Amino acid sequence: MSRVTLSRYLIEQTRSNNTPADLRFLIEVVARACKEISHHVSKGALGGVLGSMGTENVQGEVQKKLDVISNDILLEANEWGGHLAGMASEEMDNAYQIPGKYPKGAYLLVFDPLDGSSNIDVNVSVGTIFSVLRCPNQYLSQNESLNEAAFLQPGTEQVAAGYAIYGPQTMLILTLGNGVKGFTLDRELGSFVLTHENIRVPETTAEFAINMSNQRHWEAPVQRYVGELLAGETGPLKKNYNMRWIASMVADVHRILTRGGLFMYPRDAREPSKPGKLRLMYEANPMSFIIEQAGGASTNGYDRILDIKPESLHQRVSVILGSKEEVERVTAYHKE
């Protein structure tokens, strides 16, 4: 039986689910960009791409060389094809409008070009996260200037989302709103090949991912929930749990997507004015869309992540996502 490449899968989606041709093209362009990023990541010190740039992004985080390289790759790959009206990235202060010399398309692309880049120098899995939105009609005119407001749509408006994970294998995880598929990069063939047909998150779990060093700063509901996990068989949950923490959202969520579990990056008392650490638009929303499409759930503790109306491009949010039963439990604790 012949293998199904990403291109073939997307063509079949166009035939069976009326996936628009320009959306299909957009996903293929992003996938090609991810292949190029994977190449740079895999070269490491041999390619002179390790270390920092000595600059900070809009988040106040030190930019790694590969952050900037990955951002440039995604911009250059997507700006000319006529499928986008604009882009936004963790590494750019403002929205990026497609240059006037290129045709303008109907979609917006939002991305974290290299999630987990603090792990690059120690050779831990990193990845690219992306989200696709429709551009509001008022910005589709070739003469209309695009601004941040065009992107401020709740996660329920996403038409596609995915991530590439650069680890022992390079994989692309994708949802078009009808389930979650996994594609593995065949380097000999040069294509992403469908290897995971229908990814589902188990409803129950015995694993969780959280940075325990921040425990003293957490709010009471999270303190309670994690305390119950750690109590094991003798505690109220009557089950032993294992903790895993990679400090790369892509890597942690990928493990939960394939093995079940709960990923938590809750707000804490260190910066009470900030509702969380992770960014809503290009981290929490795409990952929540994927997790929900795989049968899981996602919340900020009180509300479904995908229902949150963004107020700014780089808005932060508390994130708790993964196996549905566990998400519902910790949400109930927040509401007591």
Swiss-Prot record:
This is Fructose-1,6-bisphosphatase class 1. The keyword Metal-binding applies. It holds the Pfam family FBPase_C. One of its GO terms (cellular component) is cytosol. Keywords: Carbohydrate metabolism, Cytoplasm, Hydrolase, Magnesium, Metal-binding. InterPro entries: FBPase_C_dom (IPR044015), FBPase_class-1 (IPR000146), FBPase_N (IPR033391), FBPtase (IPR028343). GO terms for molecular function: fructose 1,6-bisphosphate 1-phosphatase activity; magnesium ion binding. Homotetramer. GO terms for biological process: fructose 1,6-bisphosphate metabolic process; fructose 6-phosphate metabolic process; fructose metabolic process; gluconeogenesis; sucrose biosynthetic process. It catalyses: beta-D-fructose 1,6-bisphosphate + H2O = beta-D-fructose 6-phosphate + phosphate. SUPFAM superfamilies: Carbohydrate phosphatase. Substrate binds at D115, G116, S117, S118, N211, K277. It comes from Pseudomonas entomophila (strain L48).
